[in-house]
Amino acid sequence: MIEPLLCGIVLGLIPVTLAGLFFAAYQQYKRGSQLEL
């Protein structure tokens, strides 16, 4: 049986992690495009 607290933490961390990875990728892409120009 999965504890509600643990389930809530996991469900809360997944979107935050995805948002962090997307933001980091966007920053790297933005920085790379500026260097090329």
UniProtKB/Swiss-Prot annotation:
GO molecular function, one term: electron transporter, transferring electrons within cytochrome b6/f complex of photosystem II activity
Source taxon at top rank: Bacteria
Signal peptide: none
Function: Component of the cytochrome b6-f complex, which mediates electron transfer between photosystem II (PSII) and photosystem I (PSI), cyclic electron flow around PSI, and state transitions. PetG is required for either the stability or assembly of the cytochrome b6-f complex.
Family of the protein in this entry: Belongs to the PetG family.
HAMAP family tied to this protein: Cytb6_f_PetG (MF_00432)
UniProt protein name: Cytochrome b6-f complex subunit 5
Lineage: Bacteria, Bacillati, Cyanobacteriota, Cyanophyceae, Acaryochloridales
Encoding gene (name): petG
